């Protein structure tokens, strides 16, 4: 049996958007994604449906190779408003970083992803309307999350912090200069 998807009527798009948002809030992103695809089949440029579709895809991120990062990126970069493109691309990178963090990925990859998100949020902040602090709130969250991720120490710090350095008179002088005594 061949299955052919049925089309919704253009007059029901508003109710369908509300239903897609509700499914996202119920943590059922696959349902929201399906509804958005039905809306976009009728109105391919519907901005709210595109936003919810992209967010629904990011809701499904697990930090694995099967995450549909590129698909969500294409959706967000196709948004009409420059502010929306920057803001939602920032969310894409932030959510990707959080999924990688939950999956135990290396700190360097997570840090780079959060920094990319912050770059997009800074751009959105410059483009924002009056009384719209969404981008600032997201930037601050990324900054706080970055503070919790261990940073690799520089080579110089590793030398001075290592307890395995053999005792040598010049070592004691160096340790004294940096404020560390044995």
Predicted regions and their residues:
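Amphipathic alpha-helical repeat scaffolds of TPR domains
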Residues: 10-15, 43-57, 80-103, 133-145
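Repeat-mediated protein-protein interaction surfaces in helical alpha-solenoids
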Residues: 1-7, 30-36, 66-74
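Terminal, low-structured helical/coil segments at or just beyond the last alpha-helical repeat
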Residues: 2-4, 126, 131-182
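N-terminal interaction modules that seed assembly of large macromolecular complexes
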Residues: 25-61
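Short coil/linker segments at helix-helix boundaries
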Residues: 57-78, 88-123, 148-162
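Structural marker of alpha-solenoid helical repeat scaffolds
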Residues: 42, 75-79, 127
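Alpha-helical segment of the N-proximal tetratricopeptide repeat
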Residues: 11-35, 99, 103-104
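TPR-adjacent "capping" and linker segments in tetratricopeptide-repeat scaffold/adaptor proteins
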Residues: 1-15, 76-77, 108
């Amino acid at each position: 049996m061949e299955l052919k998807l049925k089309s919704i009527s253009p007059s029901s798009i508003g109710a369908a958007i509300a239903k897609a948002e509700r499914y996202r809030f119920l943590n059922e992103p696959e349902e929201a994604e399906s509804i958005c695809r039905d809306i976009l089949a009728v109105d391919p440029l519907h901005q709210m449906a595109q936003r919810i579709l992209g967010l629904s895809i990011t809701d499904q991120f697990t930090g694995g190779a099967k995450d549909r990062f590129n698909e969500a990126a294409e959706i967000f970069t196709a948004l009409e408003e420059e502010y929306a493109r920057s803001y939602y691309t920032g969310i894409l990178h932030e959510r990707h970083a959080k999924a990688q963090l939950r999956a135990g990925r290396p700190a360097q990859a997570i840090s780079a992803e959060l920094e990319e998100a912050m770059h997009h949020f800074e751009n959105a902040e410059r483009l924002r309307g009056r009384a719209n602090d969404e981008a600032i709130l997201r930037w601050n969250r990324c900054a706080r999350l970055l503070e919790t991720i261990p940073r690799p120490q520089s080579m110089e710090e590793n030398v001075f912090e290592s307890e395995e350095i053999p005792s040598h008179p010049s070592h004691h002088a160096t340790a004294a200069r940096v404020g560390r005594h044995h």
